[in-house]
């Protein structure tokens, strides 16, 4: 599915700037990303369904397929060179002005059962089940006919949230709450 939308309809100039900047950076690296999480939900609900989410967010979650952790380090270096600030506390997190950017790697970097283990200690584990399938069913969104981003579909977001809930339902109810959108 493909959509063409106006940045004015997104209603968040900083988000559009961030998406444009990410697109330029990832194109230069010859890498693909797609938007997941609440921002994907909000864009799709507003553009396709015509309703807005009750919860606003100032964070952006993206997924990238990488073969190994060295590639993630290369992505990190390019983003920092392009003006993103790397979090000192969270391995997946970057900052762009007021936005938090979380990058979820998947693909060959995952180990058995589609689990990633953040280096070097590998003590933080995260399930990335279904990420390939969600990408293959993503929506390509052209913004102002200037650049395009891939966004997880609503059913893809539900699959990712369901897996996250199964993975961490004893720790948090956030994923179940997010599935109720």
Q: What label would you give each PLM region?
A:
Residues 1-181:
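Compositionally biased terminal segments of proteins
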